[in-house]
Regions:
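Short secondary-structure transition/capping segments
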Residues: 152-163, 182-195, 212-221, 246-262
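Short helical patches
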Residues: 17-28, 51, 55-66
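Hydrophobic membrane-insertion alpha-helices, especially the h-region
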Residues: 33-56
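Catalytic domains of cell-wall/extracellular-matrix polysaccharide-remodeling enzymes
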Residues: 168-240
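Functionally critical loop-and-helix segments that line ligand-binding/catalytic clefts
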Residues: 66-87, 218, 222-285
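N-terminal Lys/Arg-rich, disordered targeting/topogenic segments
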Residues: 1-32
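Substrate-binding cleft of extracellular glycoside hydrolase catalytic domains
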Residues: 59-68, 72-91, 96-193, 197-199
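Flexible, glycine-rich phosphate/dinucleotide-binding loops
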Residues: 117, 146, 213, 236, ...
Length: 285
């Protein structure tokens, strides 16, 4: 196609565009309310797109959750929950009788700290009660991009006193700073892991969404740590590498807890999980 024909096509497109703009202007002039409706719909579409991009897509959300479908995975016998101040005051007597798919609760993961200064307001109570009621308990630290890895690690160690029979310490990491390279971010995460590992002589558990791990914690060194995968409302784990725990829903219901609670399963037997605990690890890797 030569330049003359291209020029004619461009001129024709311009004339058609002007006609369309003129027709749209006439329509809006005759019906001013249409402008409000058009603008409102555009803003709503933008809002939905932004919400999906930043909150839905990264976590693998499934719309069935809106209907309260906890979607219990089949074939697993060791069930547990993770809790924080969001669950409020827990009635542990009632919780002790709670069952998931006919199986009793075996373990409880408890939020302890966040960043370099925050302590969950229900941590001490939940941590003591979990041991008192016979659950295998664990404590997790919620990673913050606003504090150094070293300060966060020592904040966790100064707050949490894990004992023999407890699960290894847990690092919950879900966000990478936008202004930091993947290599620097991985170095920070490893700093936290190494400091805490030196204290307890066990490898901490890493909790995160599987897409986040594949994108930001994909270095082989992270495969040496037990993985607690967050992957909601699916029938099976899509992550191909080994994992220990699976948080499969955030809309679980149990007696003794008001509102929703996260449900988890352990990938193995109760005996296997006991071997994972502090003071009982003998070649579990």
């Amino acid at each position: 196609m030569n330049e003359s024909n291209r020029s004619k096509r461009r001129n024709n497109r311009k004339r058609r565009t002007k006609k369309k703009r003129s027709a749209l202007s006439d329509l809006l002039a005759r019906n001013p309310h249409a402008a409000w409706w058009t603008g409102g719909i555009a803003v709503m579409c933008l809002y939905v797109w932004l919400f999906y991009s930043f909150f839905v897509s990264p976590t693998g959300f499934r719309w069935r959750a809106l209907y309260g479908d906890a979607n219990y995975p089949a074939g697993y016998e060791i069930h547990g929950i993770d809790i924080s101040h969001y669950q409020g005051d827990i009635d542990w007597d009632k919780l002790r009788g709670g069952m998931i798919e006919g199986y009793p609760l075996r373990f409880v993961m408890i939020k302890s700290t966040e960043g370099s200064t925050r302590v969950d307001s229900k941590f001490i109570e939940n941590f003591l009660q979990a041991r008192e009621y016979g659950y295998i308990r664990g404590a997790y630290h919620f990673w913050s991009n606003l504090s150094s890895a070293r300060s966060q690690a020592y904040h966790f160690l100064n707050t949490v006193q894990l004992e023999d029979g407890d699960l290894p310490p847990v690092l919950d990491v879900e966000h990478k700073p936008a202004d930091k390279s993947i290599e620097d971010f991985q170095r920070d995460v490893l700093t936290w892991l190494h400091i805490v590992e030196d204290k307890y002589h066990v490898k901490p558990i890493i909790y995160t969404y599987y897409k986040f791990k594949e994108k930001y914690l994909n270095a082989p060194v992270f495969d040496d740590y037990p993985y607690w995968i967050a992957h909601y409302y699916v029938d099976k784990v899509e992550y191909k590498s080994p994992w220990k725990f699976w948080q499969h829903t955030d809309v679980g219901r149990l007696p003794g807890i008001k509102g929703f609670v996260d449900f988890n399963i352990y990938n193995g037997s109760y005996y296997d999980m006991k071997k994972l605990t502090i003071g009982n690890q003998e070649g579990v890797w």
